[in-house]
Amino acid sequence: MKLQVLPLSQEAFCAYGDVIETQKRDFFHINNGLVERYHDLALVEILEQDRTLISINRAQPANLPLTIHELERHPLGTQAFIPMKGEVFVVVVALGDDKPDLSTLRAFITNGEQGVNYHRNVWHHPLFAWQRVTDFLTIDRGGSDNCDVESIPEQELCFA
């Protein structure tokens, strides 16, 4: 099956999570007017009193043609990925309770100035880089027992 990759926007992505970006976002000045603070861009949610972790994940580029065959979700916390050097990357997401609902399966490509924050329980493809090795600032939950993985029928990503 083929899955069309769409440009990432907050409107298209809102059911799956938050788009972390400054474009079209409100800000206020701090530090004597030298800094624009784009405040509260994503809801970080961590359950069961676990720690919130800030990490760097170094992702390798995926092989082409790009096909996916599994999704994962994290029931106990949100998960945010922000490329550290402005790289474009691709995310694949779906809704669903016990298993991914393939009728909600979507793929998005960022513009190089966006990160994503997956809501708790949103099915998504494991992180990968798009065209080159990419370092992602990652914000998620510490602890164990927070990753469900499900196989899905193979999908080939198609770029317009």
Curated annotation (Swiss-Prot):
The UniProt GO MF terms for this protein read: ureidoglycolate hydrolase activity; ureidoglycolate lyase activity
Listed under GO biological process in this entry are: allantoin catabolic process; purine nucleobase catabolic process
Metabolic or biological pathway: Nitrogen metabolism; (S)-allantoin degradation
The enzyme class is lyase
Q: Which reaction does it catalyse?
A: (S)-ureidoglycolate = urea + glyoxylate
| Quaternary organization | Homodimer.
The identity of this protein, by name, is Ureidoglycolate lyase
